[in-house]
Amino acid sequence: MSNIAHTLLLFVREQQLAQDLALIGTCLHSLEAGGRRPVVVYNQGCLSNEQAFEQLKPFHLEFHLIGKGENTGTTVGRQACFEYILQNLPDVAYITELHPDMLFTPHWADVLAGYLDQTDEPIVSSGIVNRSGVLPFADRSAELPKQGGLSAAFLDSLCEDRIVHGFNNPCMHRAQALRSTGGYNPSFLTGMSCFEDDSMLLGYYYYCGIRSGWRPKVNLNAMVYHATASQWVGLGYNQMDNFNGLVRQYGAMGLKHLSELHQSPWHRSFFLGRYEQLAAPAGN
């Protein structure tokens, strides 16, 4: 049994069925090159579980299909995947979060697992290159191949022997740490998406202890293609539902700590501004 398990939310739109299935197929084809590992797939629609399993069968991966084909949002879907692994796959040491618009090299997960083996980090992210050729945490860009598609060799050519401050998906959790923090809490995060990653980062920040000065890290020795980090934007969901839940869960100081945890200037400014609004004396 592999000590790495992947999680994937299967969100197929009826009006873009062929396009979404092709995207997922390309993703899984690249993932199977890394070996036959468990992949817990949460079916969020519009396929029935029987239809979804038929789409997954061609790939040489150990699929565990959960969910009922209903779009329950990121928090519920991911948390269900985590709980399934922790309850049913006890030998798994590391758990990833994948998106269907990703392409992988055969060894990207081994690189991240090797890093976690050698450190006490609760989580680590892979480096990414997006559809515009931007490598966000490497502070540079690359020209994407115009012919032949995105190969593993091309992604490997973008790697650096460097660990930097930051967070993105795909990420890999240490299962023991995830069990301790509880993962995502749908009782607070009642929205469809947004800010669930911030909740998770705060959980790890407190897990490691404030004195440790822990910051999330990106390992640029592994590189993954991630077309876009905002699949849920523009789908009509209220992004502030989860923000309000984040505040209920962690309070104003949680926002202050997030302004220090994030690498991105936008996130730092956003969370600090919200903290200052809440901390301002009444009537100001």
Residue ranges and their predicted role:
Residues 141-164:
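Short, flexible, basic/aromatic active-site loop/helix in glycosyltransferases
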Residues 213-238:
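Active-site donor/metal-binding and catalytic loop motifs
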Residues 68-86:
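Glycine-rich, basic loop-to-helix element that forms the pyrophosphate-binding segment
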Residues 14-33:
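Short, well-formed alpha-helical segments that are part of the catalytic scaffolds
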Residues 91-103:
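Short beta-strand-to-loop acidic/aromatic patch adjacent to the donor-nucleotide binding site
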